[in-house]
């Protein structure tokens, strides 16, 4: 599903989308439904036989300014709209209302297993702590963060790698919205 939605997101926002397959994801095993591959409407053969050049798509000055304006006015809002409409990021709620965990999608199984060891989740994915799973980490959807964090005293960010890009962005989103939810992440968790 992530691959299919990634391609759809790319088309909806006219932006390249990257699917990151990390070591942790590559070592997971199990069963999942698949779909047939879909051939592209425009093939390599088409590109060779009927090349189309749009010099405005080449990112060199002065076109770079135009590209930046297009990103802010068109592509970014289109990506956010697509993410929200297709519910690509996931929310898992529970009885705990005053705190939650925000995590990257690829870390879901590891976080759930850690919660299970602590007695805060079961093997079937039922967590006693609300989870906001970011299956798309860029762009972040401000409205989803505001909804998830409203009324919560604290938030733990589980972010892989360095630096703490997501954590910094969440701070900015919440402070601009005047939400005083405390945000913790790299200060509580190992640095790598």
PLM-predicted stretches and their roles:
Residues 2-192:
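Flexible, low-complexity linker and terminal segments
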